[in-house]
């Protein structure tokens, strides 16, 4: 298993995006046209027929991202540059029952709140406050 931490990121949330086909595509196409690489994406239903889209970018791109979004979209935008990503990689991670719960419980036991989650068959990535990255990394090593 490989554990990686990344402090060089920022979380951006675009609030109240219409929940209809093509909206997320338009948003991320626009950022791509400006050479913005997206590290992680999470979406949650908003009020009514809207959604909130959160994503992580390299912190050096944050100002550019916010300026692009403010010019093109009327939605509320929030961001946090005091976050970090913690990722666990393992070939076959998805075949280990309960691994996500074990990781999330460990974070909770250490009073570390998860801001974003992304999973795949071989990885689990969480965005947490940067000040907790070292503690979370060491605690994760202990439970694995």
What label would you give each PLM region?
Residues 1-144:
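A conserved regulatory-domain signal marking ACT and ACT-like small-molecule sensing domains
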């Amino acid at each position: 298993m490989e554990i990686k931490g990344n402090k060089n990121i920022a979380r951006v949330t675009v609030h109240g995006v219409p929940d209809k086909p093509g909206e997320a595509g338009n948003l991320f196409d626009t950022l791509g046209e400006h050479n913005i690489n997206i590290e992680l994406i999470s979406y949650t239903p908003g009020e009514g027929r809207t959604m909130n889209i959160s994503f992580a970018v390299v912190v050096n791109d944050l100002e550019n991202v916010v300026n692009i979004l403010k010019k093109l979209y009327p939605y509320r935008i929030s961001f946090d540059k005091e976050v970090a990503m913690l990722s666990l990689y393992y070939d076959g991670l998805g075949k280990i029952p309960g691994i996500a719960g074990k990781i999330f419980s460990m974070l909770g036991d250490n009073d570390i709140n998860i801001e974003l989650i992304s999973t795949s068959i071989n990885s689990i990535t969480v965005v947490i406050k940067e000040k907790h990255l070292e503690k979370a990394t060491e605690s994760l090593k202990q439970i694995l």
